[in-house]
Amino acid sequence: MAGIQQQQLVNDTLPASWDGSSKRTAAVNVEGHPRPCIDHELKDPSHQKSGWRKFLSYVGPGFLVSLAYLDPGNLETDLQAGANHRYELLWVVLVGLIFALTIQSLAANLGVSTGKHLSELCRAEYPRHVKYCLWLLAEIAVMAADIPEVIGTAFALNILFNIPVWFGVLCTGCSTLLLLGLQKYGVRKLELLIAVLVFVMAACFFGEMRYVKPPATDVLKGMFIPKLSGQGSTGDAIALLGALVMPHNLFLHSALVLSRKTPNSVRGINDACRYFLIESGLALFVAFLINLAVISVSGTVCSAQNLSSENADRCGDLTLNSASFLLQNVLGKSSSKIYAIAVLASGQSSTITGTYAGQYIMEGFLELRMRKWIRNLVTRCIAITPSLIVSIIGGSSGAGRLIIIASMILSFELPFALIPLLKFSSSTTKMGPHKNSIYIIVLSWILGLGIIGINIYYLSTGFVGWLIDNNLPKVANVFIGIIVFPLMAIYILAVIYLTFRKDTVVTFMEPNKNDPQQQTNMENGLAKSTEGPEMVDRAPYREDLADIPLPE
């Protein structure tokens, strides 16, 4: 009788498609041990969570990652795209966020299905020299992403307290450390405050957009008709993509999902992947609306026929430091202060996510763990150096252009995180039965190779055009060409190597086919004992990631 009840319980917990002959492989980590997991589905149905409660238990990683899509780098590129090209580049934002949703969901699926995040899988898969190169490029991406946060914070301090931008850059070295230190006294309240301040800025731009009333027809054309006609439009489009699709976010998202307890069953993993997809979709939809509002307001105000000469000059060289006038219609004289507070919150919240990304990149590639404040201090000191030099020499205008350069660096860095993600998430040796479907494989590779192709085209044509048009002596141009062209060739060869290299390290293994009951138990997260439907021991689901301060 007990055996019948046990078999009935097993059958109830199996997926509908299970026929007893599945070849599904079981997730294990790179050391060969079964993937740590907890199966909540075996509890009595009356105690199971409802759909919404279960979904809310997975909420957190996607919204934390989405803060990167509202950072000062995004605001800067949005403002300049609107001022220079009106609504022409809205399609870039739409495509970029659709692409971001695709790859962020792949990153989440990779972490859930393998129990390892992207940098750990890279360490296991690639040879030593390749591994160290990928680690170095990932660290450069984190530092490039930190530059807009540094400059954005400096601009906010300049507006609030009228201090020089270069001094504000120095102050950023302490501001984020203070914010990280305050987390121990109530991180959820602190993150809620940051979110409120960021969405205050969003509400301001939505209110301004309602006031200026951008023509709906032109906005829709900009969203759905691809066009690159204005001077510098290609560079601005690359900068927009670089600001939207950040390499370090892929490492971060694949690690954050491991802080959630996911059952090691077909249904459990599939449910987790679906919930993370829904959460990421909601977060990125909000981010798209905010980016749309910023570009629309900037494009409408800066192209108005009754624009004053003073504001026309500001639009000609629009930066975060001078953009508060765009909100005067809604906020009046207090526009600059409220705008500065929102930019400050945006920079600080994005820096926290960058600190976590850098920590998991270092831990995954090098198995080296640092305290968060030390990690932040190292990253921030490196990011401060170029920001300080440029702000001293070029002032706020030069600092604003540095944000665009940092966004372009992120775009060129993207293939070295994106290609491993696409390959691992489409690989049977890594994902087993949870690998991407053929439709997702085709879509993700088309989008990925399209962005990589645009990067290579812009890199080559932009550099050749600069060599032709600059006023340097011919000898200097020849010397620069000798240095840069081999680097471009190495970049292309590295992309080709990562694309066509075959995965060799297996992180999935076949279950014991000689024991059908053991395979059934594995499918349902049951213990190996056949005397009763015991729960799997609550093994650590990644305690090294469980201290991430995510809202529950």
UniProtKB/Swiss-Prot annotation:
Top-rank taxon: Eukaryota
Any Pfam family the entry gives: Nramp
Renumbered residue ranges of the record's region Disordered: 511-552
Keyword Ion transport: yes
Protein keywords: Glycoprotein, Ion transport, Membrane, Transmembrane, Transmembrane helix, Transport
Coiled-coil annotated spans: none
Localization terms from the record: Membrane
Location (main, coarse): membrane
GO CC, one annotated term: plasma membrane
GO molecular function: cadmium ion transmembrane transporter activity; manganese ion transmembrane transporter activity
Composition skew (Polar residues), residue ranges: 514-523
Bilayer topology term: Multi-pass membrane protein
Swiss-Prot/TrEMBL GO biological process terms: iron ion transmembrane transport; manganese ion transport
Basic and acidic residues bias: start-end ranges: 535-545
Residues that carry a glycan: 11, 306
Family, similarity comment: Belongs to the NRAMP (TC 2.A.55) family.
NCBIfam families in the cross-refs: nramp, Nramp_1, PRK00701.1
Name by which UniProt lists this protein: Metal transporter Nramp6.1
Organism encoding this protein: Populus trichocarpa
Gene this protein is translated from: NRAMP6.1
